[in-house]
């Protein structure tokens, strides 16, 4: 309530015509400000990143894309260099390889379990007795109020206990033999993150996604749920988005199974009758393997051939009746999407992270970003 009232007071005092966010508002304060602004009738502009190229969609809400003339990648002098990232990433999806960040997490988890690393981590752990590991605004452990040396010690112990319990539960998933065909796959997202909340709306709790999926899929079809590897990795705080009880809830549903968390999603997808996701790039992997996709949210790849958005009027026949593309169709769709309506940009991502995932950015990239963003802002200002 305080956050909403503060946002309301600031916006009423400042009276802006347009609010611009560098990325889809998903952290608490930006999300509240955006929601209050929309309620007041203030225009909003934000940028949704693409995971396969240094490009983004300019949006005025989760269901509306804006792309003024001259802002698209196609209008940039480095359009060819920017769009060249797409086929490189597409090749990895065709091969079914883990993305770089998952490979890095797997390697880090192996290292973190070694006695040498545990000994090496002692100084860092001791330092958290004197200074909180996470700032209060990002401490999602539920124990942010514990202060002092003893309070911080309790917080360290409690957090590690939560982390250990979750990891044990997640790594025990898939102990039952998976069902024979036919089955459908629901690929969960790491939570909390932008691609699930808010881009996965109207789903804001992935347990609801499981329930909806189970109701959509015929009773004779098994629903195989695949947890995201990142949810239990030592590098992330998966305890902020899941609890062991979540998995008990899912397993209590009829004809619903978990795949082993360590397994590759691409291998599971190949034998599925359909795949369901919020906004994940598993949709691209699936249609490349001849498997149709149903999705809930507002992904950057929306409109991909072989996919359909789940709405109130959706039925299972809608996904079964989809015409599936070949690899050339998928490549053409992504190339056209990259050219327009996408614009150059990182959408709040750091240069280091983007270059680690995709490779070096082309020369002149940030000039192209500045030009495109300024055109988008100017267009929205003219419309207000």
Q: Where in this protein do the model-derived segments appear?
A:
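Conserved nucleotide-sugar donor-binding subdomain of glycosyltransferases
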Residues: 1-27, 99, 103-160, 334, ...
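Active-site and donor-binding regions of nucleotide-sugar-utilizing enzymes
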Residues: 1-78
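Structural alpha-helical scaffold elements that stabilize or flank donor/cofactor-binding regions
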Residues: 12, 177, 267-268
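A donor-sugar binding/catalytic signature common to diverse glycosyltransferases
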Residues: 21-25, 260-307
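A short helix->loop->beta-strand "cap" motif at the edges of active sites that frequently abuts
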Residues: 40-43, 221, 291
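Nucleotide-activated donor-binding/catalytic signature segment of Leloir-type glycosyltransferases, i.e.
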Residues: 240-260
